[in-house]
From Swiss-Prot:
Classification via InterPro entries: ATP_synth_F1_ATPase_gsu, ATP_synth_F1_gsu
Entry protein name: ATP synthase gamma chain
Subunit structure: F-type ATPases have 2 components, CF(1) - the catalytic core - and CF(0) - the membrane proton channel. CF(1) has five subunits: alpha(3), beta(3), gamma(1), delta(1), epsilon(1). CF(0) has three main subunits: a, b and c.
A Gene Ontology cellular-component term: plasma membrane
Alphabetical UniProt keywords: ATP synthesis, Cell inner membrane, Cell membrane, CF(1), Hydrogen ion transport, Ion transport, Membrane, Transport
Family: Belongs to the ATPase gamma chain family.
Pfam family, one: ATP-synt
Localization, UniProt: Cell inner membrane
Gene Ontology biological process terms in this record: proton motive force-driven plasma membrane ATP synthesis
Gene: atpG
Topology class, membrane: Peripheral membrane protein
Classification via CDD domains: F1-ATPase_gamma
Listed GO MF terms: ATP binding; proton-transporting ATP synthase activity, rotational mechanism
Length: 294
């Protein structure tokens, strides 16, 4: 009977776990839908900035206003220092979401170090911070809370530290790594070179009538736009990462719920078999006792 009690207790425990994972899946699904909408709205503004940058860059090229120069666009002859900014979740229970980001960061870290470059790691998210601290890596900067609750002003202040170091010549590249949202069941790793900006993709020919600027204004407008471009890239990456996190957690909790369901089924079969064996044993004992009394 002790065996039956143990099995029954396990069934109850697994059912409670199943309720928890099912609830977490529903919460993640609801959060994903909200984050999806926010991502769409943010992407709209990012696309608008990219379109304006393309027009301004083409205008500068058309009128040859000082050329497209400056620290923002200069590819270094040799990369001595690289800033790698990476985004992970503040929480777990989201499958391989954090692992994939960490794996990509380590791969890029080793690649640049093998070329003799110094890599400065800047972590956003508790899970990434905990991993690299545990592994003994030095983090140049870290922040908790921003990946789970993206805020434009906080994202702006965070990325401007790297922008400032880059413009002052302290770093040669700024790379942003995060796990991005593709659809409800798929995430994709993204590694974006924020600085220097590859201006070639923004200098395609556009209709000159779309934008007219005075020569002395174009450089100022471009500089202001570049900062917005970098800020929005950081902000959108945070939202994109959060959507991917909710998607990964939703899948992980769905898998856990299904596993719990299968475990309950298996334990129920074991319980019924054990109960049947117990009843059979008791019947045999009763019959044996009656036979002994004859």
């Amino acid at each position: 009977m002790a065996n039956l009690k143990d099995i029954k207790r396990k069934i109850g425990s697994v059912k409670n776990t199943q309720k928890t994972t099912r609830a977490m899946k529903l919460v993640s699904t609801a959060k994903l839908r909200r984050t999806e909408e926010l991502a769409k709205r943010t992407k709209y503004f990012e696309d608008a900035i990219n379109a304006t940058l393309r027009q301004i860059a083409s205008s500068i090229k058309k009128y040859k206003v000082g050329g497209i120069k400056g620290r923002y666009f200069e590819e270094p002859e040799a990369v001595a220092v690289v800033d790698i900014i990476f985004i992970t979740a503040d929480k777990g229970l989201c499958g391989g979401f954090n692992y994939q980001t960490i794996k990509t960061v380590r791969s890029l870290l080793e690649e640049y170090q093998s070329k003799g470059a110094k890599v400065r790691l800047r972590a956003v998210g508790k899970k990434g911070i905990e991993f690299f601290n545990f592994q003994g890596y030095e983090l140049n900067d870290s922040v908790v809370g921003l990946s789970s609750s993206p805020n434009y002003e906080e994202a702006k202040n965070y990325i401007l530290k790297s922008v400032g170091d880059f413009l002052e010549g302290k770093t040669d590249k700024v790379i942003l790594i995060h796990n991005g949202y593709k659809n409800m069941i798929t995430q994709e790793m993204k590694a974006i070179q924020l600085l220097p900006i590859d201006i070639s993709k923004y200098t395609e020919e556009v209709d000159g009538s779309m934008l007219e600027m005075e020569p002395d204004e174009s450089e100022k407008v471009l500089e202001s736009l570049l900062n917005k471009y970098i800020e929005f890239n950081m902000y959108y990456a945070l939202i994109d990462s959060l959507a991917a996190e909710h998607s990964a957690r939703m899948q992980a909790m769905d898998a856990a719920t299904n596993n719990a369901k299968e475990m309950v089924r298996s334990l129920t079969i074991s319980y019924n078999k054990a109960r049947q064996e117990s009843i059979t044993t008791e019947l045999i004992e009763i019959i044996s006792g009656m036979e002994a009394m004859k």
